[in-house]
Amino acid sequence: MKFLAKMKEKQMQRKIGGMLCGMLCAGVLVMPSAWAADYYGNDGNTKQLTGANVSLDSGNYDAVYGGYGDTEVSLPEVFKNNVTITGTAATNIVCGAYSFYGNVRENTVTISGNTLGNVVCGGGTGAADAIKNHVIIKANSEVNGIVYGGKGVTSSKENDVTISDSTINKTVYVGEADGNTENNHVTIDANSTVKESVFGGYSFKGDSKNNEVTINCGSVVTGNVAGGVA
């Protein structure tokens, strides 16, 4: 806990709405010696709910969010935001969209030729549904932490992850939720490596059904592989 205290645990949990609480407690988090800035929306400072198109090829950030909703009066959904990370841009967390209270829908993260930190997430919510979010990792990219297509609470549905010619050092969860996880899909292609496990759907309290994992020739998953876990 000394490490967590030094890294300002409360501040970090607020930033990501509890999404990484388990990782923090497990001591997975690796932070730079100095806190970098967060990046929100098109201009880096606007917590917009929809329509963000963020493209970064340089700079050092603690977290990058396309869409972001952190109040109860936000729209019911944070939706249709896009984040693309290329070049030398460095960040611990990349999220197409995050909402503390509402749904996250149809958000996309693309990582191309880059090495990133702890979490890549198409869409994450602290209270509702994650629906039709997308993560694309390609072109010799490396993610040192976990990949989520959609991380919901009540449900996680129709999210997808595509990994090609890249390395993921932790687990891939295409759809994760306390409630039902349905119709999520991951494709691992073109000599990619996942050093832990791959789950199409992962439900803590509900059902997990109609989720798919496709691993093509030349790719390797070191840990467990399951279409759905409940």
Segment roles from a protein language model:
Residues 1-22:
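Bacterial Sec-dependent N-terminal signal peptides
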